[in-house]
Amino acid sequence: AKITEMAIKKLCIKFLFVSLSFLIIIMNEYILAIESSCDDTSAAVLRGTTVLSNIIANQEVHRQYGGVIPELASRAHQQNIIPVVDAALKHANIAKNQLSAIAFTRGPGLLGSLLVGTSFSKAFALSLDIPLIEVNHTNGHIMALFAQEEGEINEIPQFPFLCLAVSGGHTQIIKVNDYFDLDIIGKTIDDAAGEAFDKIAKIMGLPYPGGPIIDRLAKEGNPNAFSFSKANLPGLNYSFSGLKTSFLYFLRDRLKEDPDFIEKNKADLCASIQKEIIDTLMKKLVKATKETGIKQVAIAGGVSANSGLQNAMHENG
């Protein structure tokens, strides 16, 4: 009886949350959205699904370490969050008392970073006496596909569709049945694709974040210059740790023969490793379309900005 009662309570809470979210969107109310899951402090104001402002404060402090330092990230969030939110409201040309709700990232992400965004959102919502909407970070990547820039009309995916959510922390193939009905049908069992890009860039001595730099250099290189061993998992799951290790050992052996090997072959190395990562992503995604029968596919997350991945998506229709 207790289990049944608890299940009913959870169902009622979910129903109320879904109803609140849809009501706010349909009524074109103003929503403040706050994101602090990693090293960027972000705030946006939306009217329904229209983005009125989107302010991002980057944390340059991590560049010297070649990766995100959690303690430094949380401190920077504390410094940035008030100015960022203030700027978001000003750019949207609204006052705080016009907000109908505050949405914030509840996870996954760095604990200290999440706490800053969560604490600020709760305190701000309490002071304004408006509802809070918790957002899963990965789901947020997907829901961003439905957002529209003011004055623009973008193509919106129709349900059901497959989404390749690929970032520094996640690599997942998600079957999106509805706004609140998402099934993960494939995921990485170790490193995320974005993490692999950044770690490989670090091995090459490139600055952080390395993914965009690899993408830029890859445009000047030969993607077939070098090949690397990669995992061939059954099903729809990914693995990138083996590819990273193969790249590391490949460079180690080449550098013994020529200490300037990386500098001489930088563009080809970037093009080749990017091709391997993208081929791995696309192979599983194409397999997912065949297994599910769903042809409509979208990409979301930070790595979706990669030009090579975008080209591969277009080539596969």
Where in this protein do the model-derived segments appear?
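Conserved phosphate-binding catalytic cores of ATP/NTP-utilizing and phosphoryl-transfer enzymes
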Residues: 135-161
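A contiguous, well-structured pocket-lining segment that forms one wall/lid of small-molecule binding clefts
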Residues: 216-297, 307-315
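Short beta-strand scaffold segments in enzyme catalytic cores
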Residues: 41-46, 163, 171-175
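Glycine-rich phosphate-binding loop plus the immediately following alpha-helix
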Residues: 177-220, 251-252
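N-terminal beta-alpha supersecondary unit
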Residues: 29-108, 137, 141
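DPxDG-like acidic metal-binding loop motif
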Residues: 109-128
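Glycine-rich beta-strand-to-loop/alpha-helix junction loops that act as flexible
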Residues: 104-107, 124, 167, 298-306
